[in-house]
Amino acid sequence: MHTTQKDTTYTKIFVGGLPYHTTDASLRKYFEVFGEIEEAVVITDRQTGKSRGYGFVTMADRAAAERACKDPNPIIDGRKANVNLAYLGAKPRIMQPGFAFGVQQLHPALIQRPFGIPAHYVYPQAFVQPGVVIPHVQPTAAAASTTPYIDYTGAAYAQYSAAAAAAAAAAAYDQYPYAASPAAAGYVTAGGYGYAVQQPITAAAPGTAAAAAAAAAAAAAFGQYQPQQLQTDRMQ
């Protein structure tokens, strides 16, 4: 004699989030207010016999099961549980407003630096000495750094005499469109960019009387050096 198994698709209820002291009797007691109950069981661990925190309740009819599932998060034995039809699966418990909070995601580049301070900028070697790292400047000082000329002043040129600077400036006017200096040998310049050199005398434009006077003064300052033609006589 074969018995037909009853369809429990719409009558079997999954109950999750149960406290560990909930028993079959206490689970049945809670759901019996919604209608007739065919079965109420708390799933336990086979080895320890303790509750695993969930169970199943089978109601006698579909209407009773719908009434039992009307509240998806009832309080059972002092703890908020989650109730749903078993064929739909477990339904997560709804968090109360104020408990859930979001954390703003930060860029990986900002996490490594406190307060999002911008990183130091390394300028191309065509503008400054290789290896020099210039820190980020404030917006108020950004206007001063927009000029294409970088003024190398201070102690960097203290070891050079006034006569040497004047001679270098006078010789540079014959071949280059910008002033050159022995101190600038370690610096590389690109087309259209130059650097200003502090000079003890006022440089004049090429081709003027002032430029000729400056060149004569520089030649007089270096009178101890032999003219370039002596080098040619030595080779002969």
UniProtKB/Swiss-Prot annotation:
Induction: By p53/TP53 following DNA damage (at protein level). Up-regulated during embryonic stem cell (ESC) differentiation into cardiomyocytes. Gene3D superfamilies: 3.30.70.330. It holds the Pfam family RRM_1. Residues 11-88 form the RRM domain. SMART domains: RRM. GO terms for molecular function: mRNA 3'-UTR AU-rich region binding; mRNA 3'-UTR binding; mRNA CDS binding; pre-mRNA intronic binding; sequence-specific mRNA binding. GO terms for biological process: 3'-UTR-mediated mRNA destabilization; cell differentiation; DNA damage response; endocardial cushion development; mRNA destabilization; mRNA processing; mRNA stabilization; negative regulation of cytoplasmic translation. This is RNA-binding protein 24. Interacts with EIF4E; this interaction prevents EIF4E from binding to p53/TP53 mRNA and inhibits the assembly of translation initiation complex. (Microbial infection) Interacts with HCV mature core protein; this interaction, which enhances the interaction of Core with 5'-UTR may favor viral replication over translation. It comes from the Eukaryota. Residues 175-199 are annotated as: Necessary for interaction with EIF4E. The RRM domain is necessary for mRNA stability and mRNA translation regulation. InterPro entries: Nucleotide-bd_a/b_plait_sf, RBD_domain_sf, RNA-binding_reg, RRM_dom. Expressed in fetal and adult heart and skeletal muscles. GO terms for cellular component: cytosol; nucleoplasm; nucleus.
